């Protein structure tokens, strides 16, 4: 009997320097739909040029790679799944972006607590945690304490999952795409 692995999911970068190029995604993840990725960058487009980006719960790295393609200076990708980190590194290499992107295997909460200076340098934080999971609230609470004034946080989440009340981060925009919501928060 053959034990073949299911094929990887394939995505495409929507726009920018590597627009139209293929990305691989690890099996078993829920990649951000291209419509939602495009909507995110329609909202935060002007913030991307020369941005320092952190992509949390990175999966395939599609959100952060899209930022690099659209002119971000650098991106750090955090995911606890070793398969995801390998796929992100492979995607960065195949797109000619390895010098601008760094993939780290780590629990997001632990990494945020251990890397306050790196989080403080970020001008754009992207997060797409598992839907309907307490990790969204926990991650936003950590980011509320760590991101610098002027930074933007973009959270993809289930539209039925309300965002928690936070101290410094305020929701300035929210859009819904089917069961998905995209919320943009900034430090006030």
Regions found by a protein language model. Name each.
Residues 1-188:
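Class I S-adenosyl-L-methionine-dependent methyltransferase catalytic core
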């Amino acid at each position: 009997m053959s034990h073949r692995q299911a094929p990887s999911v394939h995505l495409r970068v929507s726009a920018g320097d590597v627009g139209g190029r293929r990305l691989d995604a690890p099996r078993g993840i829920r990649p951000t739909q291209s419509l939602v990725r495009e909507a995110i960058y329609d909202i935060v487009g002007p913030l991307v040029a020369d941005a320092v980006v952190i992509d949390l719960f990175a999966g395939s790295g599609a959100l952060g790679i899209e930022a690099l393609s659209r002119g971000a200076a650098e991106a750090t990708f955090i995911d606890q799944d070793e398969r995801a980190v390998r796929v992100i590194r492979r995607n960065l290499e195949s797109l000619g972006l390895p010098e601008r992107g760094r993939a780290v295997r780590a629990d997001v909460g632990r990494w945020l607590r251990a890397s306050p200076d790196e989080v403080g340098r970020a001008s754009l934080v992207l997060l797409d945690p598992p839907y309907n999971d307490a990790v969204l609230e926990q991650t936003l609470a950590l980011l509320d304490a760590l991101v610098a004034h002027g930074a933007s946080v973009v959270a993809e989440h289930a539209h039925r999952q309300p965002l928690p009340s936070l101290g410094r981060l305020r929701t300035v925009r929210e859009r819904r795409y089917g069961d998905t919501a995209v919320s943009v928060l900034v430090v006030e």
